[in-house]
Amino acid sequence: MKFDQKIPDKFLDLKLDEVFGNEKRRVLLAASTHPDEEKLIAGIFLKLVKEFPDLKFVEVPRHAERGSDVADIFNDMKLPFHQRSRGGKPSSPVSCLLADTTGEMVSFINESDIVIVGKSFAGNNEGQNVIEPALMGKAVIVGPQLKNFRHVMDIMLKKNALISVGDDELENSIRDLLKNPGKCKDQGAVAKATVFEHIGATQRTIDIVKQV
């Protein structure tokens, strides 16, 4: 039943050109991250952006109030970024946006090419909802265990609709998608098709119950 979700008809104008510049870009989104995941993923981004200069990074912590903590991590790593909760825009384009705000996740997913779903790396194994990015046709990467979404994960892994890797495999998984844009696009298409295949589970269950 967790497959039954709706995507809005319209998305927010995030004005990402004001942050990243207006050159062609590919966006890596770290969605709903928890402690220790931000450092792991930011470290990987710092390596990959040297190989792929068009790569941009959007970090959305699960709890917006952790924004200052994540900002400290990025500063310690010497990662130039713009912190969205502070408003305004950077004096010059940066390659990383710390989106410590609320109500914008779906719009950020819409702007992304690759989505890493948080609470599944760096010792976190409960997982977050993978349906939204999959339904929107994005290449979705998760950790090896999503205890809270095991049923959904099993279905999607069986269809190769998710990429499930450990911490030490995450960098190469992202690199592979960046090196092979066609594969990245195909991965998103499979994810979207798999979700659509299972949409309607709630209504079918209701219909079955009515017949009993």
Q: Where in the sequence are the language-model features?
A:
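Nucleotide-activated sugar donor-binding and catalytic core shared by glycosyltransferases
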Residues: M1-V212
